């Protein structure tokens, strides 16, 4: 059993929104690892960060991600920082990983009203967002098999693009039968 798609990206890139819509389009369930972490720990992510620190949060996160990769056959949405763990990056190998790309300006705009993102809390969120970008973008690119720009694209268009890539993730391969049954 393996997820149909694993979504990764910066805060505000659309992992939750796109995840819900993609799961619906595929007729499968969505598992958000941030929600699974909160359920398992019985505390919010912000509380885990405040009480136990980022290192302990990342340990719990890796455990949850590994279990989800083994047990979930729908769409899996990872927390924005999951890829910072070498163990998570290793576990993603061989899975269909969709990187939802976003610009700094759009990411700051989309996360503006949120108080549940511990690494963006406090003054100068734009600078913090840019720092996350410089740290994480190379990691997202390394683990992804599909990349999609979410800037100025509505969620429906993003999902349609992902669906087209899931149907044919490597367009330079020999033709194969498709669900549409189109004759060639």
UniProtKB/Swiss-Prot annotation:
GO biological process entries: amino acid biosynthetic process; aromatic amino acid family biosynthetic process; chorismate biosynthetic process
Record region (Disordered): 163-184
Catalytic activity entry: shikimate + ATP = 3-phosphoshikimate + ADP + H(+)
Protein name: Shikimate kinase
GO cellular component: cytosol
Role played: Catalyzes the specific phosphorylation of the 3-hydroxyl group of shikimic acid using ATP as a cosubstrate.
A Pfam family: SKI
Highest taxon of the lineage: Bacteria
Gene Ontology molecular function: ATP binding; magnesium ion binding; shikimate kinase activity
PANTHER family: SHIKIMATE KINASE, SHIKIMATE KINASE 1, CHLOROPLASTIC
Enzyme class: transferase
Disulfide topology: none
Record text on subunit structure and interactions: Monomer.
Annotated pathway: Metabolic intermediate biosynthesis; chorismate biosynthesis; chorismate from D-erythrose 4-phosphate and phosphoenolpyruvate: step 5/7
Swiss-Prot/TrEMBL cofactor(s): Mg(2+)
Family (UniProt): Belongs to the shikimate kinase family.
Subcellular location: Cytoplasm
Alphabetically ordered keywords of this record: Amino-acid biosynthesis, Aromatic amino acid biosynthesis, ATP-binding, Cytoplasm, Kinase, Magnesium, Metal-binding, Nucleotide-binding, Transferase
Annotated residues for binding of ATP: 12-17, 117, 153
EC nos: 2.7.1.71
InterPro entries on file: P-loop_NTPase, Shikimate/glucono_kinase, Shikimate_kinase/TSH1, Shikimate_kinase_CS
Organism: Mycobacterium marinum (strain ATCC BAA-535 / M)
Chain segments annotated as coiled-coil in the UniProt record: none
Binding residue positions for Mg(2+): 16
Chain intervals with Low complexity compositional bias: 169-184
List of residues binding substrate: 34, 58, 80, 136
Cofactor comment text: Binds 1 Mg(2+) ion per subunit.
């Amino acid at each position: 059993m393996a997820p149909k798609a694993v979504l990764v990206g910066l805060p505000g890139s659309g992992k939750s929104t796109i995840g819900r819509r993609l799961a619906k389009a595929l007729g499968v369930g969505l598992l958000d690892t941030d929600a699974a972490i909160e359920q398992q720990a019985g505390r919010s992510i912000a509380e885990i960060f405040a009480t136990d620190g980022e290192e302990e949060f990342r340990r719990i996160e890796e455990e949850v991600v590994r279990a989800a990769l083994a047990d979930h056959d729908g769409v899996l949405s990872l927390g924005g920082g999951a890829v910072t763990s070498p163990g998570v990056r290793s576990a993603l190998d061989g899975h269909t990983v969709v990187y939802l790309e976003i610009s700094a300006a759009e990411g700051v705009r989309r996360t503006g009203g949120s108080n549940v993102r511990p690494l963006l809390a406090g003054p100068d969120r734009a600078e913090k967002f840019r720092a996350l970008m410089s740290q994480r973008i190379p990691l997202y690119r390394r683990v992804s098999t599909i990349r999609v720009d979410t800037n100025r694209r509505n969620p429906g268009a993003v999902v349609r693009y992902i669906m087209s890539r899931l149907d044919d993730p490597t367009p330079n391969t020999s033709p194969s039968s498709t669900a549409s049954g189109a004759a060639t």
